[in-house]
Amino acid sequence: MLKKFDKKDEESGGGSNPLQHLEKSAVLQEARVFNETPINPRKCAHILTKILYLINQGEHLGTTEATEAFFAMTKLFQSNDPTLRRMCYLTIKEMSCIAEDVIIVTSSLTKDMTGKEDNYRGPAVRALCQITDSTMLQAVERYMKQAIVDKVPSVSSSALVSSLHLLKCSFDVVKRWVNEAQEAASSDNIMVQYHALGLLYHVRKNDRLAVSKMISKFTRHGLKSPFAYCMMIRVASKQLEEEDGSRDSPLFDFIESCLRNKHEMVVYEAASAIVNLPGCSAKELAPAVSVLQLFCSSPKAALRYAAVRTLNKVAMKHPSAVTACNLDLENLVTDSNRSIATLAITTLLKTGSESSIDRLMKQISSFMSEISDEFKVVVVQAISALCQKYPRKHAVLMNFLFTMLREEGGFEYKRAIVDCIISIIEENSESKETGLSHLCEFIEDCEFTVLATRILHLLGQEGPKTNNPSKYIRFIYNRVVLEHEEVRAGAVSALAKFGAQNEEMLPSILVLLKRCVMDDDNEVRDRATFYLNVLEQKQKALNAGYILNGLTVSIPGLEKALQQYTLEPSEKPFDLKSVPLATTPMTEQRPESTSTAAVKQPEKVAATRQEIFQEQLAAVPEFQGLGPLFKSSPEPVALTESETEYVIRCTKHTFSDHLVFQFDCTNTLNDQTLENVTVQMEPTEAYEVLSYVPVRSLPYNQPGTCYTLVALPKEDPTAVACTFSCVMKFTVKDCDPNTGEIDEEGYEDEYVLEDLEVTVADHIQKVMKVNFEAAWDEVGDEFEKEETFTLSTIKTLEEAVGNIVKFLGMHPCERSDKVPENKNTHTLLLAGVFRGGHDILVRSRLLLLDTVTMQVTARSSEELPVDIILASVG
């Protein structure tokens, strides 16, 4: 009799698993029973179960002991007990990678595979293929072909699925079984047809034409298996994406025709495929949306869930296409399945009108406590999208978010809410104080370090700009008193930012920082001491440079440069300008934390794209004296069409006095090899080409890189914009495409490329200034210049802002790239660093009448960057 456990034991798992406390040595000792005569099937099957359990629990079996157990197990083939035989097949598959000489069972498996007992044949095929390698496969090829076309569906399916696994190691052999697979694909059995279709596709998937023919054949003659239809829909949609085909394609017609299939599975798969096709218009989505609308009223919960989840996805890009389903979605809000109700609500939030928000919020709040954190995050994301769509509703949405914030929940859920509140604060200045107050209350009882430090950073950034900044000090200082060291350090930094921006509060802040100097933690003490000394100087420039804006360099780059400096001692002081600049704000230069516990950081920080380029260029002897790399263009520029015989892409690398053009070349002609490849450049301005670094050899389809080194203008340093004409020159040597043999003699040839533009943006690296006003004061007005321009071809402020940001290649600060609605004036604030490490700031005041008038004020620590900005705009 089995012992009856109560519910508590069941839930805890205590005592409910009879195999829980197995010992490997004892089980292997028991395996000697396999050698006894007569065989006891029940006892042997139980021992095999124990062995399988140990393996699946991760227990390590040594090669010798596994081999001994495996050889003993082979004697069990003498028994005809069906249960024991099936257990043998399972054990063979599990131990095939552990034991040695497993091929000893090949003859036994082949015998079962070709025998009369259908229950043995399918599992025997699977086990045989598991132990067969590429060298043995040809010996059983005949049996596999027979099994694929076998009349017994389980045998045929086993052979087809096993063939699919064998493709990875023996593609050429399995490819010869295509005729048998095609015969199996016409089977009446739904699983056989599905598996056969899968094998055919994977054999042909690298041949686009063969895949197209296969789709055409099976869509024309029809399929019996709904699984096969689903497979064909996925293949067709993938083919459509790769071909970037129009919606007039037969493939799209096939997918659309599946919306009328009698199987619900196929109908949903077709609707899902259409919805996920890139660039689908609302008109093309309409049939799929209609089908999903019908599924919303299905009695099957799975169908309702699938429909509403897919509609939710459609609503992100095409909310108007889902509006017709609003009535059905509203009916699902009261669905007994909370997952369906949540998705229905979030979909309605994306498609509903402003007037329906209050009602929807009430409905959501009625069951928020009953759904999982995963779905709560979905709700928060929908509310975030709603905030951007209807900014006037921020008060209602903010209150709802704060109510959610006070409830129990995991890290991801709370982070989603905090992200949403912060985005509302940034998008809507009216909601700033309300949002900050809610966040202050949250950190009073916040168990997540990452969120607490992030909110403290936000308070230090936004709090001093509010009408009553002193009210936040109590919340921040409470963190110094009550929290652990990471949060205390964040609180000290936040306090310092209040002192740096508010002279009235400075004495109080200094008192608080003096208390922090005695903290137990080094980091907290060091921060407090540093900020205290800076603030006591009462200099705006120091406050801006060391407290409000801080470093604009790459943290991994700084770490690497400092390590290099300590390894190679020098009399010269460490030059911060030798460190690559940060392309993201400092707070984002860390891995995303996904738990509340301290996450172990990787020992080595992954190199950035610019650091990789720096190392590659430093390895070229011609570039040794160029100094540190200032900037690399974010995206390579294509100088040829993608379908031409040579594919050339250029990346521009900017140094303090030079430009290096990196040309990544690919030869797409299989009957030619190119040698000594260079790209000759002719500038239109005062640039001077200094040298070329060729690609010595460029065989077929093997990328190579050549470089051109150019000196920047010296006579007129403001003339940084330039157009280069480019010609690729090389020696052609013919080669045999089959053998790869190259002719000894070649001939000179050239290939004209597209012109290459160098703009002012190539000389400026964008940097983020959290506090633009402080940075503006820090740079000073010694080299300030101002000019007014008319943008005659631009008709909107949004277009003007976008063009200016793109043209200058600078970072918009304080969200000034967002133009408020119904305004005819706007101020754009831009920050960057000019090559050589000189800060450059631009304040652009825009006025919209008939055209846009722009007043540009530029400041820098040197005169040249200011002159270049104004000259380039003019």
Swiss-Prot record:
Short name of any one Pfam family annotated for the protein: Coatomer_g_Cpla
Interaction with ZNF289/ARFGAP2: annotated segments: 609-874
GO BP field: endoplasmic reticulum to Golgi vesicle-mediated transport; establishment of Golgi localization; intra-Golgi vesicle-mediated transport; intracellular protein transport; organelle transport along microtubule; protein secretion
Cellular localization per UniProt: Cytoplasm, Cytosol; Golgi apparatus membrane; Cytoplasmic vesicle, COPI-coated vesicle membrane
Keywords, sorted A to Z: Cytoplasm, Cytoplasmic vesicle, ER-Golgi transport, Golgi apparatus, Membrane, Phosphoprotein, Protein transport, Repeat, Transport
Transmembrane segments: none
Record membrane topology: Peripheral membrane protein
Biased composition (Basic and acidic residues): 1-11
Family per record: Belongs to the COPG family.
UniProt-recorded name of the protein: Coatomer subunit gamma-1
Originating organism: Rattus norvegicus (Rat)
